[in-house]
């Protein structure tokens, strides 16, 4: 495994054709502080620009996957908090692969609890797998926060009612990995949990076996289809194929 640029809050590396972006604040349940928010944009760009990387896996260190903003830490840095608030209000978030326009396939390998803003990384990944120890919840409403971005993202990929139930029930609605699989939030549950990274690497390598430009085109066409009607989606796919020559 090749370790890439040094980061304070992330571990970024490459194993064969697979790039790894690991949230690395395990003592804080991998919550996003000001440093991580800045580093995520750089790390996604680094992996997307690396010609040796064909697929990216995103996971967490320790027992948590990702638990959203570290509001305690950000409260100590008013300028950083104001900047994040400004970006949120303008829908200019820059921490997931989708936010940063990453063209390569991204697999979210959810190793533990995924809460609040952490759901962005599930909603915006191209493929999501989870260990049997993973769980999912959106506690925003329970703490008086009005944040629907994560659940809007999830509603593009799975049935509407369970997403609405998560949003309204807050901390009282925690989905197990198996329940998330049943609802279509994840496509695979890995048991035992300690095999998650091995399974993620194997899946990523199977995807990386294909031509990078074709992977990027297929990814783009399918994401664009979520914002179009059926006929428009077909026409868009044909146009993309013609553009590719």
Where are these regions (language model features)?
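Hydrophobic/aromatic residues within transmembrane alpha-helices
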Residues: 21, 58, 70, 121-123, ...
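An acidic, glycine-rich surface segment that forms the CoA-thioester-binding/catalytic face
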Residues: 45-48, 71-111, 151, 157
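Conserved CoA-thioester-binding segment of acyl-CoA-metabolizing enzymes
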Residues: 1-61
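CoA-thioester-processing core
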Residues: 94-103, 109, 115-168, 199, ...
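Intrinsically disordered, low-complexity segments enriched in small/flexible residues
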Residues: 221, 232, 236-245
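Glycine-rich phosphate-binding loop at the start of an alpha helix
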Residues: 68, 116, 148, 174-175
